[in-house]
Amino acid sequence: MKFAVIVFPGSNCDVDMYHAIADELGEEVEYVWHDEENLDRFDAILLPGGFSYGDYLRSGAIARFSKVMAAVKQAAEAGKPVLGVCNGFQILLEAGLLPGAMRRNQGLKFICRPVQLVVENNETMFTSAYGKDEVITIPIAHGEGNYYCDEQTLNRLVENRQIVFRYHGENPNGSLADIAGIVNERGNVLGMMPHPERAVDALLGSADGLKLFRSIVNYWRETHVVTA
């Protein structure tokens, strides 16, 4: 399986994402610059965190116009796994690949610490390695993680089981309905504010994020039969 880690000007979590895939999973991964126009050679697309284009205008607002985003949309339409973490989630929202918007944290401060999440839906290609309602520890690092959508969209997210992760015990940023991560209706595009790539080794404080990446690999292996 081959992963693409999309690199925008200002990305700063691309190396962590690469490490999680290459060193922890042992899968093939490649950095892809933001002006790439073809992602056909990749099986999964990863949009890392950071401050793309300096977060000018608002987080993800400029990155959505990068050349690579047309290819990301094509990958999503083809059913490939697309994961956006933190700034990557914000970019997916701005690009219309996920519903809703991101606002400043309720306390108007940048938050950087581990939080607990509950796995709301473990029947997705990103969460199959988790147990239903499993509580996991994943770090956050953001100033604009306050997810918001209108009531109709929220009802649809709930009905379709598109809310994959919720904050558990404490909502650190004021996010609507404690939402920490959502998928699209098809279930192949996940956006989440917490950083699973920073929780892939117990030495880092938690290895709970590794199951997310393993879930992607397991899904791909189950749906791609390799014949000799």
Curated annotation (Swiss-Prot):
One of its GO terms (molecular function) is glutaminase activity. It catalyses: N(2)-formyl-N(1)-(5-phospho-beta-D-ribosyl)glycinamide + L-glutamine + ATP + H2O = 2-formamido-N(1)-(5-O-phospho-beta-D-ribosyl)acetamidine + L-glutamate + ADP + phosphate + H(+); L-glutamine + H2O = L-glutamate + NH4(+). Its main location: cytoplasm. GO terms for biological process: 'de novo' IMP biosynthetic process. PROSITE patterns: GATASE_TYPE_1. The keyword ATP-binding applies. Signal peptide: none annotated. Keywords: ATP-binding, Cytoplasm, Glutamine amidotransferase, Hydrolase, Ligase, Nucleotide-binding, Purine biosynthesis. It is found in: Cytoplasm. InterPro entries: Class_I_gatase-like, PRibForGlyAmidine_synth_PurQ. It comes from the Bacteria. Coiled coil: none annotated. Residues 3-226 form the Glutamine amidotransferase type-1 domain. Its EC number is 6.3.5.3, 3.5.1.2. The keyword Isomerase does not apply. The active site is at residues 86, 195, 197. One of its GO terms (cellular component) is cytoplasm. Transmembrane segments: none annotated. Pathway: Purine metabolism; IMP biosynthesis via de novo pathway; 5-amino-1-(5-phospho-D-ribosyl)imidazole from N(2)-formyl-N(1)-(5-phospho-D-ribosyl)glycinamide: step 1/2. HAMAP family: PurQ. Part of the phosphoribosylformylglycinamidine synthase complex involved in the purines biosynthetic pathway. Catalyzes the ATP-dependent conversion of formylglycinamide ribonucleotide (FGAR) and glutamine to yield formylglycinamidine ribonucleotide (FGAM) and glutamate. The FGAM synthase complex is composed of three subunits. PurQ produces an ammonia molecule by converting glutamine to glutamate. PurL transfers the ammonia molecule to FGAR to form FGAM in an ATP-dependent manner. Part of the FGAM synthase complex composed of 1 PurL, 1 PurQ and 2 PurS subunits. This is Phosphoribosylformylglycinamidine synthase subunit PurQ. It comes from Geobacillus thermodenitrificans (strain NG80-2).
